[in-house]
């Protein structure tokens, strides 16, 4: 997700 951190992708 664009608004999340790298681990949230």
From Swiss-Prot:
What other facts are recorded? This peptide was obtained from dialysates of occipital venous sinus blood from rabbits kept asleep by electric stimulation of the thalamus.
- Describe the task this protein carries out: When infused into the mesodiencephalic ventricle of recipient rabbits induces spindle and delta EEG activity and reduced motor activities.
Mind telling me what this protein is named? Delta sleep-inducing peptide
Which organism does this sequence originate in?
Answer: Oryctolagus cuniculus
